[in-house]
């Protein structure tokens, strides 16, 4: 997942 999602 991208860092802003999880």
From Swiss-Prot:
A cellular component term from Gene Ontology for this protein is: extracellular region
Tissue specificity:
Expressed by the skin glands.
Q: Which residues carry this modification: Glycine amide?
A: 6
Q: Where is it localised?
A: Secreted
Keyword Transferase in record: no
Similarity comment: family membership: Belongs to the frog skin active peptide (FSAP) family. Tryptophillin subfamily.
Q: What is this protein called?
A: Tryptophyllin-T2-5
